Amino acid sequence: MRKLALSIAFVLTGLVMNAQVAKIITKVNEAGDVGSFELDCNKGFPTLGKGLKYNITRHEFKGVELKNTYHVMLVMDRFFTKVLNNTMTISAVFSDGTKVSKIETIEDDGYFDGACTLTLASPPELALNLDLKQIIVNTGEKDVVYTVSAQKSNEFKKNLKNIVDAK
């Protein structure tokens, strides 16, 4: 019985340590009118799946009308591809089938370097209320699909909620 209790304690500790809810870094520009809130990725980026990392940033513009912009930077490890066209489409697919897409311009040499930034609505209600299911990269020749697990989707929502609530 004692061994079982210790085993469960180690498993739970491992799960808690593997949860990728990141700290928030706050910055303000010199003029003091733009604040930025982003995940602290100094020790490593949180992941959505094998080879797919992300960072979330919110820019808060002060003035007559307070305005926020939300960006999700996706980094695809070892995703260097030569494409025939000069653009690629990167899409985030949510549980209700809604897509948020970005057309990425390919570098002059014809290679995609594996990084893309998606812009979310302000406030990002869609991403907070629905589960993120897939990231799809359309290279022009084929779709590369990254499936996001329920655990990673929940971690993403927690990180996004922390960015939204950051002061």
Predicted regions span which residues?
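Short coil-to-beta strand junction motifs in C2/discoidin
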Residues: 82-88
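Solvent-exposed loop and beta-edge segments used for protein-protein assembly and interaction
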Residues: 64-68, 84, 112, 129
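Internal interaction segment
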Residues: 96-167
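Short, surface-exposed beta-strand/strand-loop-strand elements in extracellular ectodomains
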Residues: 91-93
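Generic structural motif
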Residues: 4, 13-15, 59-61, 75-79, ...
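An ectodomain-focused feature that recognizes extracytoplasmic/extracellular
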Residues: 21-81
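Bacterial Sec-dependent N-terminal signal peptides
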Residues: 1-24
